[in-house]
Amino acid sequence: MYKTCVWVLLFKIVLCYEAPPATLEAIHPKGLRVSVPDEGFSLFAFHGKLNEEMEGLEAGHWSRDITKPKNGRWIFRDRNAALKIGDKIYFWTFVIKDGLGYRQDNGEWTVEGFVDEAGNPVNTEGSEITPGVEFTSTSLNPESPQSIPNQPPDNLPAKPPSEGYPCELSLSTVSVPGFVCKGQLLFEDQFNIPIHRGKIWVPEVKFPGEPDFPFNVYLSDNAEVNDGKLIIKPATLESKYGEDFVRQSLDLSERCTGTVGTAQCLREASGPLILPPIITAKISTRHQFAFKYGRVEIRAKMPKGDWLYPEILLEPRDNIYGVRNYASGILKIASVKGNAEFSKKLYAGPIMTGSDPYRSFYLKENIGYESWNNDFHNYTLEWRPDGITLLVDGESYGEIKPGEGFYNVANSYKVEAAPQWLKGTIMAPFDELFYVSIGLNVAGIREFSEDISNKPWKNSATKAMLKFWDARSQWFPTWDEDSALQVDYVKVFAI
């Protein structure tokens, strides 16, 4: 079985320790016992539901942290559980070993018999079963990974180090159970194995849409790992599907990661409304890792080529404040447009609406001596409960402070979502869980302003995508091997 290991969470990819599978026992006449052998743990946690599947890593009907072993085992005991033959328990467990956490995920166990307090199989009348009769006490879903390293459960109260915490607790929180230590590495991927094997990233398969409406479709084939780097390349739709395919239809529904039945998964060309003529890719940690507050470091080489721009983002996992027009915000970690005339301008920061002037109100710029896409650079975004700091190669170039809240300025610009942010903290909408996403976009109706002299389309025009495609003899020659977005590593630290 392939296993993963991390500092704090799921995501430093090396072979490592595997949490022991739990043994579940139905006690006669009443009760449930769950245990694992003591292998030097400092904590054991059990979370489960009776006859109801778990929703991810929820607490469950049973939610207990055990801090001491007994007779060589860590034991959870519910003396009031009234179980019967055929009942099914869905569960996950968690252990801490040598300061790192490990989970047994997606556990399923069906009551097939009972034991007494000593663990001897008994019948429903309470008499001991004759030795030799088979008795099954534990079962796992074989299709699911059994052990995924992570950090200790976050439903534990904050305790000082003297009461069991080995560190100063962080302001950061994460999407999987765990206390977080200040400065601790939460996530790391150095892209040493294919994306699908790590099972950390989800490649998007869909047509991106509002509010930016880029002129590309995301397909998984255009993201690959090569020589320790993530490579995302642009390619024409015709290179994959044939000449003039932009005037056909493309149905991604069977593997679409967007909303099936919408334009995210199915497009049909009609007159001047052609299909997005470029294929790119986007990957995200949406299903595996999200966090609130931390420092993101990404070493990347930006793409060269007209009308290309990278999307290196933090995106909201739950869209608490709304879905449309970035109502729940996005954080640009770094972006550089691929056109030569823009390649010395690095920009990043928070975006909270789809259109200017407020869209770019908080974006910060760093004008380089040379083009940012000539080489790899270290791009950093530090996200705190009181603001955001942007750095490149260790040098700060931007600071964003919310003041009394982002609402005040947004409301003066008549941003529709602004009143929703009053429900949160002064950092709203940036006070919820966000995940990491990395992608490549082409053109669209927001990133390139109308005053660019050689731009072949108007953002507001119905024929915008067609005009872009018809001008390919102008921009396509600027694309080559350097037009790929290359990422060396991604790291997320607690603050």
UniProtKB/Swiss-Prot annotation:
GO biological process entries: carbohydrate metabolic process; cell surface pattern recognition receptor signaling pathway; innate immune response; regulation of innate immune response
Reproduce the UniProt comment on modification after translation. Answer: Glycosylated.
Q: What is this protein called?
A: Beta-1,3-glucan-binding protein
InterPro entries associated with the record: BGBP_N, BGBP_N_sf, ConA-like_dom_sf, GH16, GH16_GRP_C, Glycosyl_Hydrlase_16
Keywords, A to Z, come to: Glycoprotein, Immunity, Innate immunity, Secreted, Signal
Which species is this record about?
Bombyx mori
Q: What is the effect of changing residue 75 to A?
A: Slightly decreased binding affinity to curdlan compared to the wild-type
Q: Where in this chain does the record put each CBM39 domain?
A: 17-116
Q: Residue span of the signal peptide, if any? A: 1-16
This molecule's function is given as: Involved in the recognition of invading microorganisms activating the phenoloxidase cascade. Binds specifically to beta-1,3-glucan. Binds to both curdlan, a linear water-insoluble beta-1,3-glucan polysaccharide, and laminarin, a water-soluble beta-1,3-glucan polysaccharide containing beta-1,6 branches.
Changing residue 114 to A: reported impact? Answer: No effect in binding affinity to curdlan compared to the wild-type
Q: What is the effect of changing residue 100 to A?
A: No effect in binding affinity to curdlan compared to the wild-type
Impact when changing residue 41 to A: No effect in binding affinity to curdlan compared to the wild-type
Effect after changing residue 77 to A: Decreased binding affinity to curdlan to less than 60% of the wild-type
Record's compositionally biased regions (Pro residues) = 150-160
